[in-house]
């Protein structure tokens, strides 16, 4: 008889209260009417009800809803994507305006089937949002675009307020966790983004609970700082379906608090760490606090 798989029980601190008020329902209806996708829904984010119903924010996912990769932690659909929708940038910009966002996050599925990795549509979405929403800060969260410098330059030339690219996991686990991605290529992507536009903050996220050690987490912090990453987020990995990688450990909130302090001591201008933290969670607060910390640091250096 086959041995039944053992699963780590989800702790109480990961239980959340769902809030599906009229704001949440209205935003969901608008997304469907405009044929837009959000990573909040596609990736089964645990914070969707707080962000949509309480904070009235969302992370737009462009370039369709089918990814060319099949990472073992991610719930986004995989397969052969549809053709590009060239009207998508304007629909995103209009939705940002209707929602009255002060900070918009734009992410995308990986489009390894496209020569430019989708960089052209990504850049046009940034420009479209800025034209209609001049006071809205814009954060972009692209794939590694297969490490293509020209594609990254296309995106950086659009001048987003933050370039976010997630390292996702520690070096040792990357081959098992991230399909068609490498740890070193992600670091290089972040380094090159900073070299192209030194004044644009860079950001990366690490999910933990996949079997990494504390030393490996700290090593990842050091690697990100060595490549001039400014902002870091650390969150608990949650298994989206039984087909995905199992959770090896649920970290206690106190452990996240300790990791945050370590990250800040390494020189990150901001670190958000907690069981339910995701790359885009409270992103508006992250960019504001990071700017304040950086200005204070520059002022101290001059004195």
From Swiss-Prot:
[4Fe-4S] cluster 2 binds at residues 67, 71, 74. Gene3D superfamilies: Aldolase class I (3.20.20.70). Pathway: Protein modification; protein lipoylation via endogenous pathway; protein N(6)-(lipoyl)lysine from octanoyl-[acyl-carrier-protein]. Keywords: 4Fe-4S, Cytoplasm, Iron, Iron-sulfur, Metal-binding, S-adenosyl-L-methionine, Transferase. It catalyses: [[Fe-S] cluster scaffold protein carrying a second [4Fe-4S](2+) cluster] + N(6)-octanoyl-L-lysyl-[protein] + 2 oxidized [2Fe-2S]-[ferredoxin] + 2 S-adenosyl-L-methionine + 4 H(+) = [[Fe-S] cluster scaffold protein] + N(6)-[(R)-dihydrolipoyl]-L-lysyl-[protein] + 4 Fe(3+) + 2 hydrogen sulfide + 2 5'-deoxyadenosine + 2 L-methionine + 2 reduced [2Fe-2S]-[ferredoxin]. PROSITE patterns: RADICAL_SAM (PS51918). The keyword Transferase applies. Residues 53-269 form the Radical SAM core domain. Its main location: cytoplasm. It holds the Pfam family Radical_SAM. SMART domains: Elp3 (SM00729). GO terms for molecular function: 4 iron, 4 sulfur cluster binding; lipoate synthase activity; metal ion binding. [4Fe-4S] cluster 1 binds at residues 40, 45, 51, 280. One of its GO terms (cellular component) is cytoplasm. It is found in: Cytoplasm. InterPro entries: Aldolase_TIM, Elp3/MiaA/NifB-like_rSAM, LIAS_N, Lipoyl_synth, rSAM. Its cofactor is [4Fe-4S] cluster. Its EC number is 2.8.1.8. Belongs to the radical SAM superfamily. Lipoyl synthase family. This is Lipoyl synthase. It comes from Halalkalibacterium halodurans (strain ATCC BAA-125 / DSM 18197 / FERM 7344 / JCM 9153 / C-125). The gene is lipA.
